[in-house]
Amino acid sequence: MSCFVQGIFLLQKNVSVLANYVQTVLCYSNIIKGNVIPKTNNETEDFTMKRKMVSALLCATMVAGMVVVPAATAQAADKKLIGVTMPTKDLQRWNQDGENMKKELEAAGYEVDLQYASNDVSTQVSQLENQVANGCDLLVVASIDGSSLGEPLKQAKEKGIPVISYDRLLMNSDAVSYYATFDNYKVGQKQGEYLVDALDLDNQDGPFNIELFTGDPGDNNCNFFFGGAMDVLQKYIDDGKLVVKSGQTEFEQVATANWDSAKAQDRMDTIIAGNYSDGTNLDAVLCSNDSTALGVENALAASYTGEYPIITGQDCDTPNVKNLVAGKQAMSVFKDTRALASAVVKMVDSIMKGEEPEVNDTESYDNGTGVIPTYLCDPVVVTTDNYKEILIDSGYYTEDQIK
């Protein structure tokens, strides 16, 4: 029986008993106040006894009533508040990440303050500052720009609030307690390896034309995506089997601000006009994620006349899965955000209980202040051969969603 129920039970019982003494209270109220003088010694003793009984009963009733509120208040105070900030609602994967996180945390008994920052750094700074000021017990942060949140992170550290960096590593801050993400270097490797196999680069002489696209330069994950892919592809570029006709191979040249599809499309339009407008075939496009791949695919549909290239991606966003089924995108690396959310909830739970959360990488992710203990989830390659098994049979999508 909870403290609340016990309090109500006691109060009801006392009220019932009190009813039997109402007349006594009324009759002897003056005696309790000391305003009436009994006529005999026996009467005095009787009145004194009843006065004590009434006084004790009233005190007990008051105490019982007082117990109820603090018990309920204590229960509310025990429910920890977790602040979750996501970069934007404009990309499908962040909507799914945020909702999965909120659902998992609430199921585990936490209150959740979920915020989306519309890809605006100043908005995310304000959201984090508010979460710190409003007494969040822990912060889960998927940053827009991993190097731009120093001040609210400093405030969190000063208040002893743990911070979990979610998917994108928060840089140059010693306030970061843990990092949870997918093996992002492996994501890039899988994209590069897919292109090697699809073009049969180990057996064909080539040359094959390829263009390169990655994401926002402020997102530390880009270094892993692009680095993993280029560690696979660079030797084929060096020996001439792969040719980047645009000449754009450096990270700064191939980055896409905010992972924006429109920016990727604009750049691809320019590349097509300058290098492939005469019918020259483009054989492959390395795209670090689905939003950049979508921009490339839109540009190809608008102005490219050669044979359709092999295009990589990541996240399995619904427009890209539809394009995959239609033959307009060869693959996408699937990062099941349900698995990541579950891993983070376990981390949160351990931290809130004063325990060490599970990590599986203590070497790879240095944010500029030291290596951050990290939990890595595994990515999976999705193609037309396995998309039903990976995406539909698992319940991630319904068939209707990707028709």
What are these regions (language model features)?
Residues 23-34, 38, 42-46, 50-53, ...:
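A residue-level marker of the well-folded mature domains of exported/periplasmic proteins
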Residues 64-73:
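C-terminal segment of classical bacterial N-terminal signal peptides
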Residues 2, 7, 11, 25-26, ...:
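Intrinsically disordered, low-complexity segments enriched in serine/proline and basic residues
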